[in-house]
Regions:
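The feature marks the first
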Residues: 1-52, 56-60, 64
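Intrinsic, low-complexity N-terminal interaction/targeting segments
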Residues: 1-21, 27, 68, 72-129
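Short, structured motif recognition centered on aromatic/hydrophobic residues
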Residues: 25-30, 50, 54, 109-113, ...
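Mixed-charge, glycine-accented linear interaction segment located at domain edges/termini
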Residues: 40, 116-168
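N-terminal auxiliary interaction/assembly segments of multi-subunit proteins
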Residues: 59-63, 70-74, 144, 151
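Non-transmembrane "mature" sequence context
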Residues: 85-87, 159-161, 173
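Short cysteine/histidine-rich zinc-coordinating motifs and their immediately flanking basic loops
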Residues: 168-175
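Short microdomains enriched in Cys/His and/or Lys/Arg
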Residues: 177-179
Length: 179
C-alpha cells in the first residue's frame, strides 16, 4: 500500500513544474529531501492560486510584525530554482484541496495538499496528504516559480483573451475568423 502522508519538514526542493507542450501541459508539485522525491499532480489554476496566496499571506504577516518576521519583500534572485522536475515524474496522487498556514513561533510557512476525495466512507482508507514546511525565502521562491510556470503557456488572443494554439484559433469576437 502506498504511503498516505508525505511530510517534508525541511525539503531540499519544493517546486512546481510541467510536462508537455503549451496547451497540453500537465502540472506537478514536487518535494524532495535526501531520501525521496514525492510528486503530486495539480491543476494550473491551483498552482496560480497557491503562488498568489503564498505571497498574500507572507505580505500580511510581514506587515503585522515590528520586524516583519524577517520576511523578504520578494524572492532573492540567488535562490532561483529553474531546474526541471526530477525524473521520472510519477505522481502519488492528484491534489484536491490545499491549505496554507504561518507558524508564528517557528517563523515558517506550512502547505498541506490533500488528494481528491471521492466520498469513500471506508474508515481504514486514508487519502494521501503532502505536508511541506518552507522558510519565508523558500516560499517566495516557490511563488515566483509558480507565476513563471503558469505564464509560460500559450499567449492570449488580443481580441478575445482565449489562449492561442500554435496554428491560431477561431476567434469568437471575430465571428470565427481564424487568428
Amino acid at each position: 500500500m502506498a504511503e498516505s502522508e508525505y511530510v517534508f519538514p525541511a525539503p531540499e526542493r519544493f517546486i512546481v513544474g510541467t510536462v508537455g507542450l503549451p496547451g497540453d501541459r500537465s502540472f506537478y508539485l514536487q518535494a524532495k529531501d535526501a531520501d525521496r522525491v514525492v510528486t503530486a499532480a495539480v491543476e494550473k489554476e491551483q498552482v496560480e492560486l497557491l503562488g498568489e496566496r503564498i505571497n498574500e499571506l507572507l505580505d500580511m504577516v510581514r506587515s503585522r510584525s515590528a520586524d516583519g518576521y524577517m520576511i523578504p519583500a520578494g524572492p532573492d534572485p540567488a535562490d532561483a530554482d529553474n531546474a526541471n522536475l526530477e525524473m521520472p515524474v510519477d505522481p502519488e496522487f492528484r491534489v484536491g484541496t490545499m491549505s496554507l498556514g504561518w507558524d508564528t513561533r517557528r517563523r515558517h510557512l506550512e502547505i498541506e495538499c490533500s488528494a481528491i476525495s471521492f466520498g469513500q466512507d471506508d474508515e481504514d482508507s486514508q487519502s494521501p496528504v503532502l505536508r511541506v514546511v518552507l522558510s519565508a525565502e523558500a516560499a517566495r521562491e516557490f511563488a515566483r516559480r509558480a507565476d513563471q510556470v503558469v505564464n509560460a503557456g500559450r499567449a492570449d488572443c488580443p481580441f478575445c483573451s482565449l489562449p492561442l494554439d500554435p496554428g491560431g484559433h477561431l476567434c469568437p469576437r471575430a465571428n470565427g475568423v481564424p487568428r
